[in-house]
UniProtKB/Swiss-Prot annotation:
A Gene Ontology BP annotation from the UniProt entry: secondary metabolite biosynthetic process
Binding site for NADP(+): I16, D66, R128, Y174, K178, V207, T209
Protein name according to UniProt: Short-chain dehydrogenase fogB
Disruption phenotype: Impairs the production of flavoglaucin and congeners.
A Pfam family this chain is assigned to: adh_short_C2
GO molecular function (one): oxidoreductase activity
Catalytic-site annotation from UniProt: Y174 (proton donor), K178 (lowers pka of active site tyr)
Record lineage: Eukaryota, Fungi, Dikarya, Ascomycota, Pezizomycotina
Length: 273
């Protein structure tokens, strides 16, 4: 019950998205399409995937996408379907993080909208376009080894956050946008379940990525706060989040849809402030 189909990784140019693209390549995907706002990074990660893949028949491509633009998302999705034939797995990792903390009493509306545009509307656009593409393709057996698992047209995994379920001080726009991702994922799962499409999200806490490093530099006291609330005593490495994504995409989670899979080192077991 391994990864065998085609993967579309949005936001795959770095951080968690890059780790997911590389994981699909090493876990046996047939083709990996790496999409990113930075086309050069997408092509570079695709080349890394090509080098790591165990199969000589594996292919990887880089695609440019701007998830805040409806036409760009539609065009990129259509391009991937045309090149790959179908999308079996979609991982939506594109997003922005807080670079400077702000209290509710002083947060500018433009900054709040900026987070919603990328983290929420962008997630919606990708989920919508990929849902439509998956509905148009033929169903396949989830697993030839376990035929009672039925058929599938695909699996979508969105990147949410531990801040989809709790809150932390000074980062209202991020928290609100990620709460919306969890709701979007649950409703998309309901809408898609009769079409044989599963939709889940991964909810990590802090991960060692450039986004978190920028947040630590811009939000006073965040580094100490993170250390105080993560029982495991460290932030995650991107590969640990990619492992959870691969599980939710693979046949091993064939009875899981609409879930917010928390991967947080125990963070939500403690008070967040």
């Amino acid at each position: 019950m391994d990864i065998t189909g085609n993967a579309f990784v949005v936001g795959g140019g770095g951080g968690i998205g890059k780790a997911c693209a590389l994981a699909f390549a090493t876990e046996g995907a047939t083709v990996v399409a790496v999409a990113d706002l930075d086309a050069k990074k997408a092509v570079e990660v695709a080349a890394e995937c090509q080098a790591l893949a165990p199969s000589a028949e594996f292919r990887a491509i880089g695609v440019q996408i701007d998830i805040t633009q409806e036409d760009s998302v539609r065009s990129a999705t259509e391009q991937v379907v045309q090149l790959l034939g179908r999308i079996d797995y979609c991982v939506n990792c594109a997003g922005i993080g807080v670079q400077q903390g702000a209290d509710i009493a002083t947060l500018p509306l433009a900054e709040f909208r900026r987070f919603l545009d990328v983290n929420t509307i962008g997630m919606f656009l990708v989920t919508r376009e990929v849902s439509a593409a998956m509905r148009a393709q033929e169903p396949r057996l989830v697993s030839s080894e376990s035929p009672r698992r039925g058929t599938t047209r695909g699996a979508i995994v969105n990147l949410a956050s531990v801040l989809s379920v709790v809150a932390a001080p000074g980062i209202i726009p991020y928290t609100a946008s990620k709460h919306a991702v969890l709701g979007l994922t649950k409703n998309a799962a309901l809408d898609n379940v009769s079409h044989g499409i599963r939709v889940n999200c991964v909810c990590p806490s802090w991960v060692d990525t450039p986004m978190v490093q920028q947040a630590e530099e811009g939000v006073q006291g965040l580094t100490q706060f993170i250390k105080s609330v993560v029982p495991m005593g460290r932030i995650a490495v991107p590969e640990e989040i990619a492992d959870a994504v691969i599980f939710l995409a693979s046949p091993r989670s064939s009875y899981v849809t609409g879930s917010g899979f928390i991967v947080d080192g125990g963070t939500t077991l403690t008070a967040m402030s």
